[in-house]
Amino acid sequence: LRERCGAEVVWVKHENHTPTGAFKLRGGLIYAERLRRERPYVRGIVSATRGNHGQSLAWAGRRYGIAVTVVVPHGNSTEKNAAMRAFGARVIEHGDDFEMAREEAVRLAASEELEFAPSYAPDLVKGVATYSLELFRAAPLLNALYVPIGLGSGICGAILVRDLLGLSTEIIGVQAAGAAAYARSFEEGRVVALNRAETHADGVAVRQPDAEAFAIIRAGASRIVTVSDDAIAAAIRAYWTDTHNLVEGAGAAPLAALLAERDRMAGKRIGLVVTGGNIDLALFRSWVLREPQAAVS
């Protein structure tokens, strides 16, 4: 992998090996523990998700005895839906994308007297920040760390830990080109929402940035790189070939960005965050195994 990237060293933070297969579990545990401790009378929680956030809440809710409802958009990953149900969550399909699912989750919170659990919140950032702390403590001083951006908890945690440790590491956000709301916002210096988020990498398929997350990203990230779905698929294949790890689209996006900036990062010490490995078999076959066809004149 180091040779492929042309870097002096590449450190990969493998969050695909947590009990739920993704980094989100760290935040879910912090959120559920505090809720059970401070508000034990809560009837249950409801949230919107494309999968990993919902799995984290379901797993943590089962551990702390909290009923969990998750709302997913129609067409969501069938395997992530099955995993959430296996962890004990009630799964409801609603709307065409994450934002529509979130609106339904807010409605359910009011109608069923449930606690609405946002996908970006201080407890979630505190929890997921621990993976950055582990990486920065284990790795040599990194010149740059590439982090995918969905709603922003992971990169915000990385920025906060970097600053608390007094490190000079560049934090570089990565988004899919078809769902580049944060990249667009970063360029314009204000929150910019998109009409659609089109990418096979469901973990970064967000069209409405969170204002609090954007403020942290704008102040602490060096830049945001966008990568095509073809580049993400190539990065998934590279991880499998080079490390024998199965990585989902969002988790492979940082490697895709590093490969796109190979010349710029030559000879440097680079960190990559594999945020998860939860990719449907059908999507893996139809997207990742289908290499782009060369143009024919």
Language-model segment annotations:
Residues 1-297:
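PLP-dependent amino-acid enzyme catalytic core
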